[in-house]
Amino acid sequence: MAKQKFERTKPHVNIGTIGHVDHGKTTLTAAITMVLATVGKAQVKKYDEIDNAPEERERGITINTAHVEYETEKRHYAHVDCPGHADYVKNMITGAAQMDGAILVVSAADGPMPQTREHILLARQVGVPYIVVYLNKADMVDDPELLELVDMEVRELLSTYEFPGDEIPIITGSALKAMECACGKRECEWCKSIWELMDAVDEYIPTPQRAVDKPFLMPVEDVFSITGRGTVATGRIERGQVKVGDEVEIVGLQDKPRKTVVTGVEMFRKILDVGVAGDNVGCLLRGVDRKEIERGQVLAKPGSIKPHKSFSAEVYVLTKEEGGRHTPFFNGYRPQFYFRTTDVTGVVKLPEGVEMVMPGDNVRIDIDLITPIAIEEGLRFAIREGGRTVGAGVVTGIRE
């Protein structure tokens, strides 16, 4: 069978299943593909195919992730599901699977469990903006009052972590029964909940703003001068767009950003009208000396990002087997933090009551860099020692 062309007619959204081990995340993922396959909107993925997820490497970290795709009438979805709890932690912190929204799976028979709480906290920390809840295994609960109780508990837990617990849609059903039935009819006792869930995901999780519509930002990878024309900074545009005549700021490695004007945009030595997110371009900058700009800085829309030295982050520390440290680290640890294109040394401050951090842990820390870098919430980074990756993190807040 010939490969189908990827149709870009529908808006694209990235989602994933999160929640406690054995609450039914993978079963639900399989059930979604089976139900949607009945109307030609997905390819069936069996439980085992999803559960035996292949290993991937992101920033030197091994993560097991299953990717499935499907669509509804309204949108196209890329859905990630991870077999193990550690995989979720790594996935969410490295941003390997960027989620525009998540389906939190909670077993109605057990209610919220430790990892339910941990995944909600992680979602809050790493900036997963929306959550929809699937209350699974409802076939195992005879008492409707018990379902109501779990519903309330989940809403309270979500509110604790600053999600709008009262507004979040909670769909009740049984992923296993839907998977076993797989007739896909909306009126079916079991398949109905899958349709309700997809409707809730369609309605409640907004279509994300496309990278090209965000304010311009390009990490500077290389700098050279062209005799008679000036200084060119090259890099891959991370977001937004840039054209000749745009005012931009050079941000990072200096205390104050510096304004300049783009007098030329080139791609593969050809002149471009406009460079957009994803393009590798060279920007000719007016009045900037070759020595006044360097790798590690960014070009950005004025006022859209500032240089900072102090921030909070959620980090995952690699295990020895992953090529990380063999020993714990303590307060005052001084590794390098690799942001976008450059390493900067920083000092780690552990939270109160935490004596040390072991390989394999995930922890919230405060970091003070020795030079300012263009930083914002949600920015991913690697922690390195002598060029070797020993951890991964995401900025959760700026501290000045």
UniProtKB/Swiss-Prot annotation:
Keywords: Cytoplasm, Elongation factor, GTP-binding, Hydrolase, Magnesium, Metal-binding, Nucleotide-binding, Protein biosynthesis. It comes from the Bacteria. Its main location: cytoplasm. GTP binds at residues 19-26, 81-85, 136-139. It catalyses: GTP + H2O = GDP + phosphate + H(+). It holds the Pfam family GTP_EFTU_D2. Residues 19-26 are annotated as: G1. GTP hydrolase that promotes the GTP-dependent binding of aminoacyl-tRNA to the A-site of ribosomes during protein biosynthesis. Belongs to the TRAFAC class translation factor GTPase superfamily. Classic translation factor GTPase family. EF-Tu/EF-1A subfamily. Monomer. This is Elongation factor Tu 1. It comes from Pelotomaculum thermopropionicum (strain DSM 13744 / JCM 10971 / SI).
